[in-house]
Amino acid sequence: MARFKRILLKLSGESLMGEKQYGIDEKRLGEYAQQIKEIHDLGVQIGIVIGGGNIFRGLSGASKGFDRVKGDQMGMLATVINSLGLSSALGAAGVKARVLTAIRMEPIGEFYNKWKAIEAMENGEVVIMSAGTGNPFFTTDTGSSLRGIEIEADVMLKGTRVDGIYTADPEKDPTATKFDDITYDEVLKRGLKVMDLTATCMCKENNLPIIVFDMDTVGNLKKVMTGENIGTLVHN
């Protein structure tokens, strides 16, 4: 029995690289698709937002001389590439998926609106929402917060490379300790980098809880959905 009826799953573009230095690792993509299939089989309604950092990141482009708006638009297109890849992998796993885009680009994907996304999820399709918010200066974390709120998700599941939120970066500080759960106020007070400030405040103001967990460990997504105590819960 799944603990949530409808979720927004945020996936890191960088995680799609797997062992590669750039692009999409087919093995990692297949593992993600299989994990998503497992919770889809539980009857969960699934919306997904994927980053584009494995291909291009607008902010890093700006630091190298790109115009920020054009750089962000390149980043949005990177999320569409990743979304098409995941959609294809889900199809191969026997799960019907639909790509919606925040910018019109038919026939690559359908133009996003809330009602279309909800109807598709209620009909058993996995909905992958790409191209961020369609606007520059917004991260994919902010895009996933917005979409999670719009589709009335019960929770945002933020799949990362680490197994939750720590007092400091566990990859740099061996004394860092993990939170099992933490409030939004505490996240903001401590300046913890769960997501960017805009995304965090949106979730707080709209009472959308987040579970941060390690998506790269196969089986973890189902464990989160069936109530096992992994990751970190962020809530009001």
UniProtKB/Swiss-Prot annotation:
Q: Which UniProt keywords apply?
A: ATP-binding, Cytoplasm, Kinase, Nucleotide-binding, Pyrimidine biosynthesis, Transferase
Give the pathway. Answer: Pyrimidine metabolism; CTP biosynthesis via de novo pathway; UDP from UMP (UMPK route): step 1/1
Q: What InterPro entries does its record include? A: AceGlu_kinase-like_sf (IPR036393), Asp/Glu/Uridylate_kinase (IPR001048), Uridylate_kinase (IPR011817), Uridylate_kinase_bac (IPR015963)
Indicate yes or no for the key word rRNA processing: no
Where along this sequence does the record place binding of ATP? K10, L11, S12, G13, G53, R57, T160, Y166, D169
Enumerate the catalysed reactions: UMP + ATP = UDP + ADP
Compartments in which it is found = Cytoplasm
Q: Name one GO cellular component term.
A: cytoplasm
Q: What is the activity regulation comment for this entry? A: Inhibited by UTP.
GO BP field: 'de novo' CTP biosynthetic process; UDP biosynthetic process
Entry's EC annotation: 2.7.4.22
Q: Where primarily located?
A: cytoplasm
Provide the GO MF annotations for this entry.
Answer: ATP binding; UMP kinase activity
Provide the residue positions that the database annotates as binding UMP.
Answer: G52, D72, T133, G134, N135, P136, F137, F138, T139, T140
Q: Does the UniProt entry include the keyword Protein transport?
A: no
Function statement: Catalyzes the reversible phosphorylation of UMP to UDP.
What HAMAP family does the entry give?
PyrH_B (MF_01220_B)
Q: How does it assemble?
A: Homohexamer.
Family membership: Belongs to the UMP kinase family.
Q: What PANTHER family does this protein map onto?
A: URIDYLATE KINASE, URIDYLATE KINASE PUMPKIN, CHLOROPLASTIC
What name is this protein filed under?
Uridylate kinase
